């Protein structure tokens, strides 16, 4: 059971758990409270009566004898004392908590400041590292440039020495004897001069060998070009001769073609005239018309086929020629003397292809000339069916006078590229005139033909 006295410093009751101290003035306090009071107060005085007290005057511990039966009894004062003590400790703890919380807040603020400082320092560190790497690269680049500059200086020095040597060699090659001797005297007579003279000798020897090679190659090239020039001139002369020959052949071919066209036109006119004369229904040409139109094939007519041209060149069949058509003669034909048929003994043109076809066509279609040979030759030449159809006697009285009007078997151009035999009446005056006179239309070539002919490519253009 606690004592009914309490400490005026802490207001707690005295108990056996804590030591009690006393001062000479008689006042009692807890020992801890008194020591704390003396430690915090400016002067050592009694907390209650305020008298001066020294450390020797303090009784540190008082002993109280308490009965044992009273220990088991809990009274309100002890409980209150315990509650007050707990409240005091709680207040102390809360105060410590507040102090610790303030300390934690200050530490957190300091930590935030330190984090910001660390981030800025890290950023500065990164910048410094980047700057260091850049500076290292720049240092490497400068070292490389320095080495290149050093190498360039060495090369420039070597080239300068080489240039001096080349200038000296050029002086040796191009200068006069006196200048060379003066240069050799300036060099002196030491080991370096001997080495320089040896270099000059070797260079001169190499230059001499190079000049010999260049001269040899130039001579070979000149000879080769001379041969090529000779062959080119020979080829040019040969080509010029061939061109002249081809031009002459072309002009001859054009002339022959022009004459052949004229001959074809004249032959066409003669054929038309003969067809008109054969269309009259007279007794004298009935056998001829029957022989021509009913015969399976004319005498000596071969199967038409394509043959190469005689000159060996291609012929443009689309080319036309401007040839004036003669006017039709409306006058009466003059009575011609009686002419007998005579066969042409010339060879067939197909059997002699080497002859000129223009010359053969001129001799085959001649209308003048009568029968000068014997009748036995004609009988041997004419076939039997022509004799039976042309030379038999007619019992009719109107046909008696036609015995003398015999024709001639001729060989001429058939219009298909070959030759054939045909019957030519000898007396054209006995042919009965037509019932109606056919007016011949004038055929005029358009001017576009000449322009198209002029626009055709010529052989001379290809030979240029």
From Swiss-Prot:
GO cellular component, one term: nucleus
GO molecular function: MCM complex binding; ubiquitin protein ligase activity; ubiquitin-protein transferase activity; zinc ion binding
SMART domains the record matches: RING
Chemical reaction(s) catalysed: S-ubiquitinyl-[E2 ubiquitin-conjugating enzyme]-L-cysteine + [acceptor protein]-L-lysine = [E2 ubiquitin-conjugating enzyme]-L-cysteine + N(6)-ubiquitinyl-[acceptor protein]-L-lysine
Biological-process GO terms, alphabetical: DNA damage response; DNA repair; interstrand cross-link repair; protein ubiquitination; protein-DNA covalent cross-linking repair; replication fork processing
Family assignment from sequence similarity: Belongs to the TRAIP family.
Function comment: E3 ubiquitin ligase required to protect genome stability in response to replication stress. Acts as a key regulator of interstrand cross-link repair, which takes place when both strands of duplex DNA are covalently tethered together, thereby blocking replication and transcription. Controls the choice between the two pathways of replication-coupled interstrand-cross-link repair by mediating ubiquitination of mcm7 subunit of the CMG helicase complex. Short ubiquitin chains on mcm7 promote recruitment of DNA glycosylase neil3.
Name of the protein: E3 ubiquitin-protein ligase TRAIP
Organism of provenance: Xenopus laevis
Name of the coding gene: traip
């Amino acid at each position: 059971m606690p004592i009914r006295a309490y400490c005026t410093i802490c207001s707690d009751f005295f108990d056996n758990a804590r030591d009690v101290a006393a001062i000479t003035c008689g006042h009692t306090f807890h020992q801890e409270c008194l020591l704390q009071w003396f430690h915090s107060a400016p002067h050592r005085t009694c907390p209650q009566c305020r008298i001066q007290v020294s450390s020797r005057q303090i009784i540190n511990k008082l002993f109280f004898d308490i009965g044992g039966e009273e220990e088991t009894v809990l009274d309100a004062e002890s409980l209150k004392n315990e509650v007050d003590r707990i409240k005091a400790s709680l207040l102390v703890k809360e105060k410590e908590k507040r102090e610790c919380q303030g300390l934690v807040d200050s530490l957190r603020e300091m930590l935030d400041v330190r984090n910001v400082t660390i981030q800025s320092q890290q950023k500065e560190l990164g910048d410094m590292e980047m700057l260091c790497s850049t500076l290292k690269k720049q240092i490497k680049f400068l070292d490389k440039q320095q080495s290149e500059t050093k190498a360039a200086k060495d090369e420039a020095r070597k080239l300068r020495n080489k240039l001096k040597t080349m200038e000296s060699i050029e002086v040796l090659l191009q200068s006069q004897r006196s200048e060379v001797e003066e240069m050799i005297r300036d060099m002196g007579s030491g080991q370096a001069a001997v080495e320089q003279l040896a270099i000059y000798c070797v260079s001169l020897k190499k230059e001499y060998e190079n000049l010999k090679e260049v001269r040899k190659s130039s001579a070979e090239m000149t000879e080769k070009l001379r041969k090529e020039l000779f062959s080119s001139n020979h080829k040019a002369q040969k080509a010029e001769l061939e061109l002249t020959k081809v031009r002459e052949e072309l002009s001859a071919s054009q002339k022959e073609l022009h004459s052949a066209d004229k001959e074809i036109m004249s032959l066409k006119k003669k054929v038309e005239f003969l067809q008109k004369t054969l269309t009259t229904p007279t007794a004298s040409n009935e056998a001829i018309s029957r022989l021509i139109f009913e015969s399976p094939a004319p005498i000596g007519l071969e199967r038409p086929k394509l043959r190469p041209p005689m000159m060996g060149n291609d012929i443009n069949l689309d080319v036309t020629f401007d040839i004036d058509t003669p006017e039709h003669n409306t006058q009466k034909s003059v009575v011609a003397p009686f002419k007998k048929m005579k066969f042409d003994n010339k060879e067939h043109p197909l059997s002699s292809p080497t002859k000129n076809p223009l010359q053969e066509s001129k001799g085959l279609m001649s209308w003048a000339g009568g029968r000068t040979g014997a009748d036995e030759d004609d009988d041997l030449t004419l076939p039997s069916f022509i004799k039976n159809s042309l030379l038999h006697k007619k019992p009719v009285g109107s046909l008696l006078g036609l015995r003398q009007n015999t024709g001639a078997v001729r060989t001429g151009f058939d219009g298909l590229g070959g030759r054939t035999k045909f019957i030519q009446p000898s007396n054209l005056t006995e042919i009965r005139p037509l019932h109606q006179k056919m007016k011949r239309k004038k055929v005029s070539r358009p001017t576009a033909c000449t322009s198209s002919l002029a626009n055709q490519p010529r052989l001379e253009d290809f030979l240029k």
